[in-house]
Amino acid sequence: MNLNNPSRFLAVLAVVVAFALNVAAKDIKLLNVSYDPTRELYLDFNTAFVNHWKGKSPRDTITIQQSHGGSGKQARAVIDGLEADIVTLALAYDIDAIAEKGKLLPADWQKRLPNNSSPYTSTIVFLVRKGNPKGIKDWDDLVKPGVAVITPNPKTSGGARWNYLAAWGYALKRDNHDEAKAKEFVAKLFKNVPVNETGARGATTTFVQRGIGDVLIAWENEVLLSLKESGNGEFELVAPSVSILAEPPVAVVDKNAKRHGTEAVAKAYLEFLYTPEGQEIAARNFYRPRLEAVAAKHAKDFPKLNLLTIDEVFDGWQKAQQAHFADGGIFDQIQTGSR
């Protein structure tokens, strides 16, 4: 080929440049497998992250898919082959299970991001109907005869496990750490649960849309979202005297992301949750931000609560899971009426 001909040289150069640009452009697809009530948060966050990534790599095409359900159920789906690049679940035990049973990420995954890989927090509060007709003020009111309590199944829902442990922690504090009395209290509470929903969003739908129950035990973000969406004073938030600090964690599913070629983008996606923009998105979707400046800005949006922690009351999620939610554990004993 005679490249001394300027027009021919430019034509060849154009082909080379076009090929190089085409090679550089990537069609990226991420799957975020998340727990039940994070739909709105991640729809909002995904839009911001796509814009952020396009600013760095303008030729890339990025599509983020979401999967939602009860946290325990979602973890099992990933272990069984759902090819998540990222998991954003309700509690650390569920990601531990993916690491231990699925061998899809390292056991020390929590050390890879700040705050034990938990970019935002939440807690457990109550939602009651307008005027609070049953006079619900604290956990004790949930075990009274004739009070229908809506909470999902702890076997499938991460939020339900937080609900259960918050109630247990309250009973321990009230009764001088008497485990037998705590078990009796939680058993009474679950006797007042008329519907066995598998996830937090299903429980909210049962209470808010189907009109079943006198009180919903729920994630704080789910309650605040329900208040916003109803907009007419149809419901009220009740903050109990004691609740629990819920720390939903996030992780890259290494083996899947490596196979998909999405490791760098998946890592950047989770890191973006910790930026001021990511924290602001969490706050406006009613999750408590970790970043102090953003938390201070939104402090008025969240009730002040006395919060227990999973470590101080239950010595971490591994022990809580085995004692309370494993097959034959305390929750199963409560359900069957055994000791």
PLM regions and their residue ranges:
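Bacterial N-terminal signal peptides that target proteins for export
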Residues: M1-A11
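Bacterial N-terminal signal peptides
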Residues: L10-N22
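N-terminal segment of the mature folded domain
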Residues: K26-S157, N306, I334-Q335
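Short beta-strand->loop
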Residues: V33-Y35, V128-K130, A148-D175, F190-V193, ...
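Sec-exported extracytoplasmic/periplasmic mature domains
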Residues: N46-G55, I79-E83, A92, A99-K103, ...
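Short helix-loop capping/hinge motifs at secondary-structure junctions, enriched
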Residues: G131-K137, T156, G169-H177, N256-A264
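Ligand-binding pocket segment of bilobal, Venus flytrap-like solute-binding proteins
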Residues: R174-S241
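Extracellular/periplasmic juxtamembrane helices and adjacent flexible linkers that interface
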Residues: A257-R339
